[in-house]
């Protein structure tokens, strides 16, 4: 099975207008990603406010994205839920709509044991035939995969990768030492992309690439060509942007940044609120300093 979980994957924002999906803005956003040749797009993840979507909105978002992208780049859907049955519904709908794979985190809030986490993903694996990437974000979910659980899950045929949002740079080395060779590990933390990939990672699920896909793509390309100096120069330029995009809870800052650049409305769903004036000013200054344009 081809492993689509590698390279630059943009964790895409979801545009809203008047509390509805803004499909015109969605098309602008997707075409911007396609133009800059990202390796895949993640729809309805945490950056995409997936937990705020109704099931009907989720279906519409995926279906519209699939139609606009038209197989030019892989689409990965977010299927995280603390209700295993509902996560299976999301995965089943993703299969029906024909996305290319899906991502899911351990169930949040309910704090399952490692056995419970394994059974959750085993049920998802049995219920669909799509490739799966595990999503490790313990600051959001409250629980995480142990290394042993990752090893057990990697033995399931279609569980092909791990997205790790942590800062434990020893983890990719530990996981790489125990899993099968074709199991991919990607960072979901923009600030550690180079260090993580130096330790065995093979890609980056990025927030910054919503607005700077060209720079993010160039960074990875230089890294893959062993141009460490060139990659580090771009990384250092982008570091203020990475930090600005996490001044407040993701996706509050990136939604404002996209709005400032004309990609979408600055509309975010409760309980999240729009960026503070202070955060807005810092984001604007960094966008100007980096000469980011759409």
Swiss-Prot record:
HAMAP family referenced in this protein's UniProt entry, alphabetically: DapA
One GO term of the biological process aspect: lysine biosynthetic process via diaminopimelate
Binding of pyruvate, residues: 47, 205
Pathway: Amino-acid biosynthesis; L-lysine biosynthesis via DAP pathway; (S)-tetrahydrodipicolinate from L-aspartate: step 3/4
Active site: 135 (proton donor/acceptor), 163 (schiff-base intermediate with substrate)
UniProt keyword terms in alphabetical order: Amino-acid biosynthesis, Cytoplasm, Diaminopimelate biosynthesis, Lyase, Lysine biosynthesis, Schiff base
Name of the protein in question: 4-hydroxy-tetrahydrodipicolinate synthase
PANTHER family: 4-HYDROXY-2-OXOGLUTARATE ALDOLASE, MITOCHONDRIAL, DIHYDRODIPICOLINATE SYNTHASE
Keyword Cytoplasm: yes
Listed EC numbers: 4.3.3.7
Cell division in keyword set: no
Catalysed transformations (reactions): L-aspartate 4-semialdehyde + pyruvate = (2S,4S)-4-hydroxy-2,3,4,5-tetrahydrodipicolinate + H2O + H(+)
GO MF annotation, one: (R,S)-4-hydroxy-2-oxoglutarate aldolase activity
Known partners and oligomeric status: Homotetramer; dimer of dimers.
Similarity section: Belongs to the DapA family.
InterPro entries assigned to the protein according to its UniProt record, in alphabetical order: Aldolase_TIM, DapA, DapA-like, Schiff_base-form_aldolases_AS, Schiff_base-form_aldolases_CS
One term under GO cellular component: cytoplasm
Protein task: Catalyzes the condensation of (S)-aspartate-beta-semialdehyde [(S)-ASA] and pyruvate to 4-hydroxy-tetrahydrodipicolinate (HTPA).
Compartments reported by the entry: Cytoplasm
Listed SMART domains: DHDPS
Positions of the record's site feature: Part of a proton relay during catalysis: 46, 109
